[in-house]
Amino acid sequence: KAIVPVALYGMPYKVDEIMAVADRYGIPVIEDAAEGFGSRYDGRMLGTFGKYGVLSFNGNKMITTSGGGALICPDGEAKREIMFYATQAREAYPYYQHERIGYNYRMSNICAGIGRGQMTVADAHVAHHKHTCDLYRELLKDVRGITLHENPSGRFDSNYWLNTIVLDPLLRVKGQENAYQATVQGAVGGAGGVTHAAVNAHTDCEPNANVEAMRVGLDAMGIESRPLWKPMHKQPVYKDCPAYVNGVSESLF
């Protein structure tokens, strides 16, 4: 078992509270810092608080190797064990000998080289995203019904990988009253050239209709946006899995 806190959209999680629970019950922490490269808590980089930290170098992240990511290890011994399993768990024989199940998680030298080059501009990328947040803060300061998600205190230092807003449930976008229903009925999904169409709206944990209305309204003005992640326990594929929730994620969605 493990605790996996997430730096959602770059925002640091409540490090002190999570670590206190982990220490009390002896549960290892594996940080999901996929979106948190460059974010800090009390001046310390995310991904370095837990036993392991996970970074993503996907094409849309703060820096990229075109795909893949990195695992932050606590020491050399842990790194050697991880690399053993990441390179197919091949034993030290002149032929292929496998006594344990391994995986092919190696990153090519070409992708790694791209990542090394990206490191030279990492600070500039973080600064640019923070500048974008400053711009949104200025533009939204007098807009009623919209709250920009910002650092809750000086201890938090988000990279603002993506900027997020919370909409007042009473907010209405003129002319977009049926945006959600219309979008779902015409939506397509998939990847790699394989697509499928949605048939109807989901009845379980539908997003606030204002969210889709705002997205469509912004799209008409050439501004890209998207809904918050759907709560994982509300994904149909996980419907039979146990979940301990308090309603916050559903209300935000």
In which residue ranges do the predicted regions lie?
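PLP-dependent aminotransferase class I/II
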Residues: 2-6, 11, 15-17, 24, ...
